[in-house]
Swiss-Prot record:
InterPro entries: Class_I_gatase-like, HST_MetA, MetA_family. Gene3D superfamilies: 3.40.50.880. CDD domains: GATase1_HTS. The record marks G111 as: Important for acyl-CoA specificity. The active site is at C142, H235, E237. This is Homoserine O-succinyltransferase. Keywords: Acyltransferase, Amino-acid biosynthesis, Cytoplasm, Methionine biosynthesis, Transferase. Substrate binds at K163, S192, R249. Belongs to the MetA family. It is found in: Cytoplasm. It catalyses: L-homoserine + succinyl-CoA = O-succinyl-L-homoserine + CoA. It comes from Vibrio parahaemolyticus serotype O3:K6 (strain RIMD 2210633). GO terms for biological process: L-methionine biosynthetic process from homoserine via O-succinyl-L-homoserine and cystathionine. Pathway: Amino-acid biosynthesis; L-methionine biosynthesis via de novo pathway; O-succinyl-L-homoserine from L-homoserine: step 1/1.
């Protein structure tokens, strides 16, 4: 089944050229099944690029998904046209009275900024608290995973000395967990972060199910027992050239970034990178939608409550 997004959203044309089924709002209205309602809080600077990446992954499901885009505040963006934000993005005041099946909170380039120094930190905390009573399952990606762990477990910010950048091997730890169904025993996924997610630290200070780790990158995937909070510390949504663009950006800013690990053929930035994580990203989002959202959410979102959730895997 397709995703349902506004006809004029730039991602619509991009996804259609990739032969991805995008349903118009008119056609979707004639469907007799209840579509899933997913809200994306986009914290990345290049919002059009990021929304397209996440919509691509959400589209690979037999479930119909209605997507709404949320911005953190109304400050002008340096990287996204104001017209785009005004047309396609909601303010929190416009959605806080609704319930959603799923919420995705994207990463943000704030790895070296303390939480209390993030200009929208208080607003982000408000949204995360709101999600506890209005969202079936929340997916926290990269920096948002660190922010979510701070809110839910009061974990201090842990920062690596050097930025983690590249594509890393990961191992799964519970092949029978629903979100890991169909995963290979080892898989590749990209990371681009300063945040440190030590398996030992999370095991000691949380009750999370730690589902996938990397010897180098640490914890990659973890969930709460009820699957209502899912933490992904990498960037499975990244396009093949996203790490490259970040590397070139950092070079242009006079930094001395390390070449992203296991990314360029022969470790040579002159060679076009190969996306070795694409199938993993699609399977991860498919499983999240199916097992953490669809099979957990109440049929009637107007009667959202803890008691409405199924406890079966």
């Amino acid at each position: 089944m397709p995703i349902r997004i506004p006809d004029q959203l730039p991602a619509s044309d991009v996804l259609r050229t990739e032969n991805i089924f995008v349903m118009s709002e008119t056609r979707a209205a004639s469907q007799e099944i209840r579509p899933l309602r997913v809200l994306i809080l986009n914290l990345m600077p290049k919002k059009i690029e990021t929304e397209t990446q996440f919509l691509r992954l959400l589209s690979n499901s037999p479930l119909q998904v209605n997507v709404e885009l949320l911005r953190i505040d109304n400050r002008p963006s340096k990287n996204t046209p104001t017209e785009h934000l005004d047309t396609f993005y909601r303010q929190f005041e416009m959605v806080k009275g609704k319930n959603f099946d799923g919420l995705i909170i994207t990463g943000a380039p704030l790895g070296l900024v303390q939480f209390e120094d993030v200009i929208y930190w208080d607003h982000l905390k408000t949204i995360m608290e709101w999600a506890k009573d209005h969202v079936t399952s929340t997916l926290y990606v990269c920096w948002a995973a660190q922010a979510g762990l701070k809110l839910l477990y009061d974990l201090p910010k842990k920062t690596r000395k050097e930025k983690l950048s590249g594509v890393y091997h990961h191992q799964i730890h519970n092949p029978f967990h629903p979100i890991l169904r169909g995963f290979d025993d080892t898989f590749l996924a990209p990371h681009s972060r300063y945040a440190d997610f030590s398996p030992h630290f999370l095991e000691e200070h949380t009750d999370l199910d730690i589902l996938a780790t990397s010897d180098v990158a640490g914890v990659y995937l973890a969930t709460t027992k009820d699957k209502r909070n899912v933490f992904v510390t990498g960037h499975p949504e990244y396009d093949s050239h996203t790490l490259h663009n970040e590397y070139i950006r950092d070079l242009g800013e006079g930094m001395e970034p390390a070449i992203p690990v296991n990314y360029y053929p022969n470790n040579n930035p002159d060679n076009p990178p190969i996306a070795s994580w694409r199938s993993h990203g699609h399977l991860l989002f498919l499983n999240w939608l199916n097992y953490c959202v669809y099979q957990q959410t109440p049929y009637d979102l107007d009667h959202f409550s803890e008691d409405a959730f199924t406890k079966d895997d």
